Amino acid sequence: MQIYVVKPGDTLFSIGRALGLAPGFLARYNGLQEPYRLAVGQSLLVLYPEQTVTVQPGDTLTSIAASAGTDVASLYRMNPNLSGSDRIYPGQILVTQLEQAARRPAVVSGYAYPNVSERVLRGILPYAGALAPFTYGFTPEGALVPMDDERLLALAGACGVQPLLHLSTLTAAGAFSAAQAAALLRDPALQQTLAANVLQTMLEKGYEGLDVDFEYLGRDLAEPYAAFIQLLRDTLAPYGLPLITALAPKTSAAQPGTLYEGHNYASLSTASDAVLLMTYEWGYTYGPPMAVAPVGAVRRVVEF
């Protein structure tokens, strides 16, 4: 695997010739569609197929996978143009083995709205280890705000992807409320009710883990929040269900700001089975032009 950075005058075909790779494979692995416009500075993923097969009449993905000594999930990963569909046709060329395998394991997870395009999701799930439908909120009484997540759970199950219940401060009115979170964190009985409802929903729907994302809590609620996370973990642990806590991207313990002060890295890390650094909050629609997650900024958070 390598990364090629587009230079002035490059085309998909000139890059393919220079790298000894069919332009069609470049397009396939980078989600490019005709007329294959490229931007100077754009990074292209370069993967070299080591083995391919031409689909014959009567072939299915299952039969091709068996003949190639692989599985259908791997075929989906090596052939993103399939978009998770099992529809193939005679004469189609499928990759059954890449020249270079991944050198180290990676865990890939993501969030998805319930109305996400099925085609988009099917194209992504073969590469994912976990999927969190976005999002479950809660009422002032500690009940979960319902979410139409059945379709996403079915797709995750079909692709062998672990479903995570995402818990946030969403209200029944559809807005995120730090005030409602504050009321919860100051009421131990309400926390017990919410924890029980979370567990019940996870067991009923087949969720295999919990991802908690409470933001803009402020310094005063940092320790109560960590205690709530510990309560959730203690509730889930007997059932073998892990808890992940989303952390705001901090670079120092004293970093000012309501978003950062509410997340005590040490306390939350101790109370959680795993943490997710939300290092995707820099580049956004209404901010200055930049990458969603600039490498330098991400590195500073990880090093802290």
Regions found by a protein language model. Name each.
Residues 12, 54, 61-64, 138-146, ...:
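Second-shell loop/turn segments in exported
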Residues 42-57, 62-63, 83, 92-109, ...:
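Intrinsically disordered, low-complexity Ser/Thr-rich linker and spacer segments
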Residues 99-192, 197:
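Glycan-recognition patch characteristic of GH18 chitinases/ENGases
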Residues 114-117, 136-140, 169-174, 216-220, ...:
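Solvent-exposed loop/turn segments at secondary-structure junctions
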Residues 140-147, 223-304:
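Substrate-binding surface in catalytic domains of secreted glycosidases
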Residues 193-224, 274-288:
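Active-site groove signature of glycoside hydrolases
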Residues 1-19, 42-69:
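Primarily a LysM-type cell-wall glycan-binding module
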Residues 111, 132-134, 164-168, 211-215, ...:
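A cross-family glycoside hydrolase active-site/sugar-binding cleft signature
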